[in-house]
């Protein structure tokens, strides 16, 4: 429900900007395109090759206590049921921390060796 509230507030802000009288001519199309470009960049999904397995990465925004966080998820459906999860203030940090969480869990479950885990944990 919080995501819907934030989306509603963003839409209301754009509508308000469009209908408020402006002292000069504004380029509304450029403004809306810029806002939508920034908002759509918050979500990200990708497929990666991880130690010979096809894995997925997903990042999505989340608001908690009026602060923007990025939740990351890393999983390999054809290999294991484990998932790496994270919540950070950094977009790139969320995917990196989710990958590290997955590597830690895979190491604990003896799916990978310590040497191969160290290569991913240092990077």
Curated annotation (Swiss-Prot):
Disulfide bonds join 55-76. GO terms for cellular component: extracellular region. Keywords: Antibiotic, Antimicrobial, Disulfide bond, Secreted, Signal. Pfam families: Anti-LPS-SCYG. It comes from the Eukaryota. GO terms for biological process: defense response to bacterium. It is found in: Secreted. Residues 1-26 form the signal peptide. Induction: By injection with lipopolysaccharide. Expression is highest at 3 hours post-injection, decreases to basal levels at 12 hours post-injection and is up-regulated again at 24 hours post-injection. In the presence of recombinant ALF, the expression is significantly down-regulated at 3 hours and 6 hours post-injection. Strong expression in hemocytes, heart and muscle, with weaker expression detected in gills and hepatopancreas. No expression detected in eyes. Binds to bacterial LPS and may specifically inhibit the LPS-mediated activation of the hemolymph coagulation. It has a strong antibacterial effect especially on the growth of Gram-negative bacteria. This is Anti-lipopolysaccharide factor. It comes from Scylla serrata.
């Amino acid at each position: 429900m919080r995501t819907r509230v934030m989306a509603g507030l963003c839409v209301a802000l754009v509508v308000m900007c469009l209908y408020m009288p402006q002292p000069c001519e504004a380029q509304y199309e450029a403004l809306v395109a810029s806002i939508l470009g920034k908002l759509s960049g918050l979500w990200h999904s990708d497929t990666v090759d991880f130690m010979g397995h096809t894995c997925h990465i997903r990042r999505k925004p989340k608001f908690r206590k009026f602060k923007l966080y990025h939740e990351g998820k890393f999983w390999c459906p054809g290999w294991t049921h484990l998932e790496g999860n994270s919540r950070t203030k950094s977009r790139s940090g969320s995917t990196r921390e989710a990958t590290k969480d997955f590597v830690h869990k895979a190491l604990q479950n003896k799916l990978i060796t310590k040497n191969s885990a160290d290569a991913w944990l240092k990077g």
